[in-house]
């Protein structure tokens, strides 16, 4: 697609360019997704995750902007794979935007067919929060990554990663959270990436501490800090599919090993062994079929090394990029011998309706976020783990684009927080409305058998009714915009998922919508896990009064 060099930045303050705050919020969040501080390749409309875009092409982007500027308070804009296709009369409590991105009929749900359609200009890849306009930069995945490594520490290392070394790879928009998440848990991490720009970006934003091109130097620093039991993160330039086998050959085994390279997309994401970023780009253009095959062969080597490390005692887990599936398809029959991060560490949180809840200050004023931090510290003071997160985030997380915050809140907590935020906007404590949203990676909004719904207790991993029901209930309850996507995180054919965003503009109507949406949305997570037979979900549903007709 054509590259357009222009700097897009969301407006700040209280002056509207649209006919209402919900439309304004959608416009600012679309533009914020493409802010150079936030997006990975804004000139190509790519936000994160290989080719995860905010709009299909530049013509569609400008048409969306124009549509949002003229959209009435009782109209709904429909967006099909990043292209605005209709505006219908609806009503004031309806979503202002409905988005469907990258969805394919199952028999045709593969990368080859997607790329044919993309080439014809008929489709785009929306990832999760790229095409649904609620990406907030690397902070968006940071607490989830912090929670994952924290749970690994609780299960295997007496509650802290002090004195441990983690080896991982992939420092893009998602994987870039890993170095800081490990050091927040007290550990040492060597994070590998083949693209120097990705490492530089994480260092610039204080997500990573040091840069090196030398494996020897990385190991020396890691060992020094491991001995001192002090945290440090080292960005190592190289290809994990070369470096991990080399470590296995030398019998250098880390305490933990995982991976967040863009393995979900063998063509536009992963870079094969032996190629620089520039050489890979040339091969991708000249011979895409050979590129994909080389990528898949490299992924197989990568997973073989992870399995070898697991055999030698490393705590090993898949971080949701579908690399095990590719290795399995390439003939590595034991590729799934190490678990995914959700069944290993996160599912109990999902059973309580917990997930990555985020909010953004449309004012552009960091003080608005700091005031909301104080709300969390006051209202949820009994949750020491959550409060520790907020305190660390304030100190260590640099905002990208509009100021924002993320934390994991559960059923009941999200609605309570939303009510308070809306009241703060109403009484002027906050200088402009707040956008409340979440990742599609949530407790009740995704079907992804190699990630969020891997190894479900009842075998319902591939049942995709749940994200559809999630989107439907959020729409009728008045979310500001709702999205249904395919292929996020793990690639074409492997996931369906839904997103929602709601705007706290201080009005009484918003208060009612917030109460409904922020109850039903996490409620779907509780319901989904009750249905699968999880005792903790049943206990949560009974304690919180979630109405589930056939619950025993």
UniProtKB/Swiss-Prot annotation:
The prosthetic group or cofactor this protein requires is: NAD(+)
Catalytic reaction(s) noted: 4-imidazolone-5-propanoate = trans-urocanate + H2O
Keyword annotations for this protein, in alphabetical order, are: Cytoplasm, Histidine metabolism, Lyase, NAD
Give the annotated active site.
407
GO CC terms on record?
Answer: cytoplasm
- For the ligand (NAD(+)), the binding residues are 49-50, 127, 173-175, 193, 239-240, 260-264, 270-271, 319, 489
Q: What is its main location?
A: cytoplasm
Q: What is its EC number?
A: 4.2.1.49
List the GO biological process terms.
L-histidine catabolic process to glutamate and formamide; L-histidine catabolic process to glutamate and formate
Give the matching Gene3D superfamilies.
Urocanase like domains (3.40.50.10730), Urocanase superfamily (3.40.1770.10)
Name the pathway it acts in: Amino-acid degradation; L-histidine degradation into L-glutamate; N-formimidoyl-L-glutamate from L-histidine: step 2/3
Pfam annotation, one family? Urocanase_C
Q: Which family does it belong to?
A: Belongs to the urocanase family.
Q: What does this gene product do?
A: Catalyzes the conversion of urocanate to 4-imidazolone-5-propionate.
Q: What protein name does the entry list?
A: Urocanate hydratase
- What is the originating organism of this protein? Bacillus mycoides (strain KBAB4)
Source gene?
hutU
């Amino acid at each position: 697609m054509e590259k357009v060099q222009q700097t897009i930045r969301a407006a700040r303050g209280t002056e509207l360019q649209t006919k209402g705050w919900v439309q304004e919020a959608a416009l600012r969040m679309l533009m914020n997704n493409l802010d150079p501080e936030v997006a990975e390749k804004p000139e190509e409309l790519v936000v994160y995750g290989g080719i995860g875009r905010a709009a299909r092409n530049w013509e569609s982007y400008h048409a969306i902007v124009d549509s949002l500027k003229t959209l009435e308070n009782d109209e709904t804009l429909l967006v099909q794979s990043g292209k605005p296709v209709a505006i219908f009369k609806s009503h004031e409590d309806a979503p202002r935007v409905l988005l469907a991105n990258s969805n394919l009929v199952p028999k045709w749900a593969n990368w080859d067919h997607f790329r044919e359609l993309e080439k014809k200009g008929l489709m785009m890849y929306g990832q999760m929060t790229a095409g649904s306009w609620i990406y907030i930069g690397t902070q968006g995945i940071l607490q989830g990554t912090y929670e994952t490594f924290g749970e690994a520490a609780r299960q295997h290392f007496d509650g802290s990663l002090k004195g441990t070394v983690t080896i991982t790879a992939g420092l893009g928009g998602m994987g870039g959270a890993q170095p800081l998440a490990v050091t927040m848990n007290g550990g040492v991490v060597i994070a590998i990436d083949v693209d120097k720009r990705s490492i530089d970006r994480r260092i610039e934003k204080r997500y990573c501490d040091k840069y090196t091109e030398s494996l020897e130097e990385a190991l020396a620093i890691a060992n020094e800090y491991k001995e001192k039991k002090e945290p440090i993160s080292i960005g190592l330039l190289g290809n994990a599919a070369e470096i991990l086998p080399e470590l296995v050959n030398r019998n250098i085994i880390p305490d933990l090993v995982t991976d967040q390279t863009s393995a979900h997309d063998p063509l536009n994401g992963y870079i094969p062994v032996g190629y620089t970023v520039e050489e890979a780009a040339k091969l991708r253009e000249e011979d895409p079929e050979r590129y994909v095959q080389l990528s898949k062969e490299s992924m197989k080597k990568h997973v073989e090394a992870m399995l070898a490390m697991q055999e030698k005692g490393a705590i090993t887990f898949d971080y949701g990029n579908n690399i095990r599936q590719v290795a399995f398809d390439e003939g590595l029959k034991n590729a799934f011998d190490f678990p995914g991060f959700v069944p290993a560490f996160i599912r109990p949180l999902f059973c309580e309706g917990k997930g990555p809840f985020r909010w953004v200050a449309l004012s552009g004023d960091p003080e608005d976020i700091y005031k909301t931090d104080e709300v969390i510290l006051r209202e949820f003071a009994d949750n020491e783990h959550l409060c520790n997160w907020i305190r660390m985030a304030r100190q260590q997380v640099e905002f990208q684009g509009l100021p924002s915050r993320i934390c994991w809140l559960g059923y009941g907590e999200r609605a309570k927080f939303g009510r308070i935020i809306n009241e703060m906007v109403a009484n002027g404590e906050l200088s402009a409305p707040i956008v409340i949203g979440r990742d599609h990676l949530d407790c009740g909004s995704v079907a992804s058998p190699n990630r969020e719904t891997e190894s479900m207790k009842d075998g319902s991993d591939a049942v995709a009714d749940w994200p559809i029901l999630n989107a439907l209930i959020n729409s009728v309850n008045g979310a500001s915009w709702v999205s249904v996507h395919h292929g996020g995180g793990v690639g074409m054919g492997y996931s369906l998922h839904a997103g929602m965003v709601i705007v706290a503009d201080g009005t009484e109507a918003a208060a009612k919508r917030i109460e409904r949406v922020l109850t039903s949305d996490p409620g779907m997570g509780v319901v989904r896990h009750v249905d699968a037979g999880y005792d903790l979900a049943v206990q949560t549903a009974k304690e919180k009064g979630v109405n589930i007709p056939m619950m025993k």
